[in-house]
């Protein structure tokens, strides 16, 4: 057993609230006195349908989702949505637009570009030579008014960038399609500013295995009949999310996280905590006299994924190893970026972030 509390800084699958894990443990063999474990429930049973509907309603309440938006709990991860969004919403359009600001929006752009009938235009990109150190302001996006949609990622998990203000377009412009995987539920925003939102659960929602999709009803009229039903949003909605067997346990766990977030005071309250957590780490980095480096423009720094390095690869490796010995786990940066990355999603307690900041100062004292 570790001498220290274990804090999981993984980018995903990520930390889950301790209270949620405790509830799941208590209900593992017998959910709510039914005698059934959730993992063994039929997805069409009244027991599971109640879990599904409560999860949907709680998410709708947390995000203030308008009535003219549908919520789906799908499979395939956010990467499936790169193509699924385009397959459903670009039909009959000559162009669609994409904003590339980091690793995942770049992959989304590349995947969408494989569609043969719709040209995916690069409306904006992050920095010279795609160095991803800054974010192009929304007013600089080269958006074609007659495009099918504009796709972007509001928070870049790998590169550690995040739009300070959640982007929105003026009335009459194409609908925004947003990858919110690594920031959904971390701060308030207006769902009505978007045509479609998707998010892999394994960061701020729950365990891996489910992807949340929030889509405006009028856009479902675009869904073509000549794509496979399993990739058609309308097919899933027409069957109340039961076109195929959903990820029942992941949905159950996500529902527990929604209830936990409500108990914390909702999104507005958790946003204040998230702001303090990010401030704690960035002040430690900026106050290190250059020992720790974060090259991201300050106004574009992510509050969810804090990236940093020492400038010495061997010292970075030592940092990750020594941190893990003190219960500060999974801090290694993404393979294409290197250095360290602290993912501080909703479920990461402030105590964990303060423990990391203390370790960073101690490490600098010993190796600086």
Curated annotation (Swiss-Prot):
GO terms for molecular function: O-phospho-L-serine:2-oxoglutarate aminotransferase activity; pyridoxal phosphate binding. L-glutamate binds at residue 44. GO terms for cellular component: cytoplasm. One of its GO terms (biological process) is L-serine biosynthetic process. The modification N6-(pyridoxal phosphate)lysine is found at residue 203. CDD domains: PSAT_like. NCBIfam families: PRK05355.1, serC_1. Homodimer. This is Phosphoserine aminotransferase. The gene is serC.
